[in-house]
Amino acid sequence: ESLKDETVNICKKYSASVILRKKLNLQRKGYALDEAVKEILSKKQKYDAYFIFDADNVLDKNYIKNMIPIFDKGYDLASGYRNCKNGNKSVVAAASALTFSLVNTVFNNKKNKETRNITFSGTGFYIRGYLIEKWKGYPFHTLTEDYELSSYATLNNLTTYYNTKSIFYDEQPLRFKDTINQRIR
């Protein structure tokens, strides 16, 4: 995405697999996820779940360990608790962090208690492998593909869960211009 982005070099340093986008004319996260998932599916390996994270996310050391009991209960999709890495760096970052906190802590906690479907917000969640295989990719491509996924889950009676014990840290944009670019890239 950026000349300063060291993600690929960091991945190579740790011998992680890297999937480089080919269809750069299709902008937005949903298209990037679709391309990556199709590449993974083409290798004909089966996975129990696909975890969706942004490159700048940092997982708590117990994130996966704390997500396993939720997976074992049979939930189709589950989101972890998003904490902010840089909420004190600017007003825009603070507002963004508060928005995610409101959606997750207030709304998703309440939905969990009422056994209603949660609202996914971009990153830090898993999707069961059978769904990815059924979809043959990641079919959510709107500007708010995470809300599209949330709506799909509700309309198709998929089970969702908000897991406050699976913590991850996300970096928020510092300038308003960056929030706009983040949505349309």
Where are the predicted features?
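Active-site donor/metal-binding and catalytic loop motifs
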Residues: 164-179
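A conserved acidic beta->alpha catalytic loop
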Residues: 1-8, 23-25, 58
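Short acidic donor-binding/metal-coordinating loop in glycosyltransferase active sites
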Residues: 47, 55-57, 145
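Catalytic donor-sugar/metal-binding loop of nucleotide-sugar-dependent glycosyltransferases
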Residues: 115, 141, 150-168
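Acidic donor-binding/catalytic loop of UDP-sugar-dependent glycosyltransferases
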Residues: 5-6, 53-70
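Long helical/loop segments within the catalytic core of UDP-sugar-dependent glycosyltransferases
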Residues: 20-43, 62-142, 180, 184
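Short aromatic/hydrophobic "clamp" motif used to bind/position activated sugar donors
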Residues: 50
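Short, structured coil segments at secondary-structure junctions
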Residues: 13-15, 156
